[in-house]
Amino acid sequence: MRIKILSLLLLSFLASASVKNGEIAPSFSLLNQDNESVSLDEFKGKKIILEWTNHDCPFVKRHYDTENMQTIQKDMTDNEIVWLSIISSAKGKQGYVTKEQAKELTSERNAHPTHVLL
């Protein structure tokens, strides 16, 4: 429970770095793991968690290996909070994955994001 609260606080802190709570976030659109366009505007009026993730990052590995992140994702999505996992590593760079690899990682880790965006 302590780790869950700390993780949520960290996510809240990171999210508030450029957009204040209650303000409208700038819109963006990205393709998801199924090659469908997902726009932030689709979730207007809903609470959204943006998770920048990199499967090779030791901190990300730790949270997924302990199933800490999956538990938080499931709790949030079960409570109608949108969870967008964003993999922003460029092709040829550390952490890059294809859409198929993103699907495999999500399945292997038993992750529960609403979408994985690439």
Predicted stretch roles:
Residues 100-118:
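Short, internal strand/loop/helix patches
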